[in-house]
A protein has these predicted regions:
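Conserved serine/cysteine hydrolase catalytic core
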Residues: 173-215
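Gly/Ala-rich beta-loop-alpha elbow adjacent to hydrolase catalytic centers
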Residues: 79-87
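Flexible "cap/lid" loop of the alpha/beta hydrolase fold
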Residues: 92, 98-130
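Post-His helix in hydrolase/transferase enzymes
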Residues: 233-248
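Conserved alpha/beta-hydrolase catalytic His-Asp/Glu region
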Residues: 112-113, 133-191
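Active-site loop/oxyanion-hole signature of alpha/beta-hydrolase fold enzymes
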Residues: 37-76
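Conserved loop-alpha-helix segment in the C-terminal half of the alpha/beta-hydrolase fold
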Residues: 28, 197-231, 237
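Conserved HGGG/HGGXW glycine-rich cap/lid loop of the alpha/beta-hydrolase fold
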Residues: 1-48
């Protein structure tokens, strides 16, 4: 999207998400200033029969694409949730160069293989039906979600819209691989790359521990504090989100 000679902005979706549901509303707001590239993860692309491998294998594929099509240099990358882990990995590995890396209120959770397996095995049966069918399999969970959406206003509805509709082509194994691999793939501490700024949209309602986590993994992160919930700026305030991205990357 956008002019071929414009600065490149790479958009990376969140956990088990499709690029269009995450970024469809903001691409038109960005395409006047950037050449916008959206990552479609293996296993979550309706045009392919693939499964998500691991975070590092997917990172290598992204790097290879950027080397081939962008000369290995882009203006900025924005990672929504899980996508922020990819931004961190791209910065730390230094196989491509970006002027700005932006993390969208990513949690950057990490766990031991055993703990990650337990978390994955517990959450996957709950999450996968939502990916495949667009709704929870357990009726009581769907009722609670519907009630929460009615009571909480725009955020839950907007967040569910960002998560996307039913995607029967996504396998449980892809979701499992993505969730588990994200937890066990280490992100180095005090990442510092000359010529690369790291910006983080810090959603304060997620909790104070994330400030310390961001400062643990990045040497000089620029925190953009917002009294919001996880990815609420992107989900509910796309115009403001696009304005902030432009103010950082242009």
């Amino acid at each position: 999207f956008g002019a071929e000679d414009a600065p490149v902005l790479l958009l990376l979706p969140g956990t088990c998400c499709h690029w269009k549901s995450n970024f469809g509303a903001v691409i038109p707001l960005l395409a006047d200033s950037f050449r916008v590239l959206c990552v479609s993860y293996d296993g979550f692309d309706e045009t392919e029969q693939t499964e998500f491998p691991t975070m590092l294998e997917e990172t290598e594929k992204i790097e290879a694409y950027l080397k081939t099509h962008c000369g290995g240099h882009i203006r900025a990358a924005y990672g929504c949730s899980l996508g922020g882990s990819f931004v961190g990995l791209l910065a730390a590995r230094q196989n491509i160069h970006m002027n700005c890396g932006i993390l969208g209120s990513s949690d950057l959770d990490q766990a031991s293989p055993l703990a990650a397996r337990l978390q994955t095995d517990f959450l996957l049966p709950l999450i996968y039906p939502v990916v495949r069918d667009g709704k929870f399999k357990a009726k009581f969970l769907q009722k609670r979600l519907d009630k929460s959406a009615r009571e909480s206003g725009d955020y839950v509805k907007a967040f569910l819209k960002m998560f996307g509709k039913a995607r029967p082509y996504v396998t449980m194994q892809s979701c499992k691989n993505q969730f588990y691999s994200d937890l066990i793939t280490p992100l180095p501490d005090k990442i510092h790359v000359p010529g690369t700024e790291i910006h983080i949209f810090y959603a304060l309602k997620m909790g104070a521990k994330y400030r310390a986590r961001y400062q643990q993994h990045f040497a000089h992160p620029v925190l953009h504090e917002q009294n919001l919930q996880h990815e609420e700026l992107l989900a509910c305030h796309p115009v403001q989100w696009a304005h902030l991205v432009k103010s950082i990357a242009l």
